[in-house]
Amino acid sequence: MTEQAISFAKDFLAGGIAAAISKTAVAPIERVKLLLQVQHASKQIAADKQYKGIVDCIVRIPKEQGVLSFWRGNLANVIRYFPTQALNFAFKDKYKQIFLGGVDKRTQFWRYFAGNLASGGAAGATSLCFVYPLDFARTRLAADVGKSGSEREFRGLGDCLVKITKSDGIRGLYQGFNVSVQGIIIYRAAYFGIYDTAKGMLPDPKNTHIVVSWMIAQTVTAVAGVVSYPFDTVRRRMMMQSGRKGADIMYKGTVDCWRKILKDEGGKAFFKGAWSNVLRGMGGAFVLVLYDELKKVI
């Protein structure tokens, strides 16, 4: 293997391991966030049974669905997250070579910043093309609030993918893809761009204290998450439409979804579950720091 191939493999491994660990740890918060986002578009949750907020959701889930249901959809998320994050990190460095070749970060700060934004956004969009059906399945499984097998919409990851493909074709697994690409570019651009730029401006980036790295990563993750959150809400609402027919279809398309959420629920609805997203973001920040530490070891 060439040195470049070994470096790529190390990036893939370090990114994937870090992601799988952190995602499982924050899975309960992730499920709460998803339920708050999509409950308005769920056929299983009646208007009078909707969750009032994070605390109500955390209290009711174990009572109504069992404690283990907090991890519903987590397997799909870990499977999805391993290639997503690993590909993101690996491609990010390849895109950095394209966008940042020959750029001096000390004398060309804004050119350096723009290159980091572009490489982060391009890496996220590229990865999304490969793993979107897994992201779709994770959302639908997490939104499934049935207690037992007969009450549940899907029995698991495979059942979800098969049922939606039979009903809507492969296209059904890519519902909300366009708005996802828009959101992922905004999120990843901030996530990688600001993080790398901030680290690059430190006196000795390779030997930065882990606490400083974590603080930078935490801030970046929170800012990126809030900025791109409305796009995430719209894409997940669109995902909830797959498998529906006729009068059950709530939104004619992405633009109609934006318009109806704003008209029927108000601007605040775009940010439902956003606070739990910030809490979950601690796991995302941990991924960035853990990735850097793993690369030193591998």
UniProtKB/Swiss-Prot annotation:
Modified residues (N-acetylmethionine): M1
Description of activity control: The matrix-open state (m-state) is inhibited by the membrane-permeable bongkrekic acid (BKA). The cytoplasmic-open state (c-state) is inhibited by the membrane-impermeable toxic inhibitor carboxyatractyloside (CATR). Proton transporter activity is inhibited by ADP:ATP antiporter activity.
Residues exposed to the Mitochondrial intermembrane side: 1-7, 100-109, 200-210, 292-298
Gene assigned in the entry: SLC25A6
InterPro entries: ADT_euk_type, Mit_carrier, Mitochondrial_sb/sol_carrier, Mt_carrier_dom_sf
N-acetylthreonine: modified positions: T2
Topological region Mitochondrial matrix: 38-74, 131-178, 232-273
Reaction it catalyzes: ADP(in) + ATP(out) = ADP(out) + ATP(in); H(+)(in) = H(+)(out)
Annotated source species: Bos taurus
Stored Pfam families: Mito_carr
Motif (Nucleotide carrier signature motif): 235-240
Domain notes: The transmembrane helices are not perpendicular to the plane of the membrane, but cross the membrane at an angle. Odd-numbered transmembrane helices exhibit a sharp kink, due to the presence of a conserved proline residue.
MF-aspect GO terms: ATP:ADP antiporter activity
Regions that span the bilayer: 8-37, 75-99, 110-130, 179-199, 211-231, 274-291
Record key words, sorted: Acetylation, Antiport, Apoptosis, Membrane, Methylation, Mitochondrion, Mitochondrion inner membrane, Repeat, Transmembrane, Transmembrane helix, Transport
Subunit details: Monomer. Found in a complex with ARL2, ARL2BP and SLC25A6/ANT3.
Segments of this protein annotated with the region Important for transport activity: 235-240
Residues annotated with N6,N6,N6-trimethyllysine modification: K52
Subcellular location: Mitochondrion inner membrane; Membrane
GO process terms (BP): apoptotic process; mitochondrial ADP transmembrane transport; mitochondrial ATP transmembrane transport; negative regulation of mitochondrial outer membrane permeabilization involved in apoptotic signaling pathway
Membrane topology: Multi-pass membrane protein
Gene Ontology cellular component terms for the protein in this record: membrane; mitochondrial inner membrane
PANTHER family to which the protein is assigned, alphabetical: ADP,ATP CARRIER PROTEIN 1-RELATED-RELATED, ADP_ATP TRANSLOCASE 3
Disulfide bridges in this chain: none
Name of the molecule in the record: ADP/ATP translocase 3
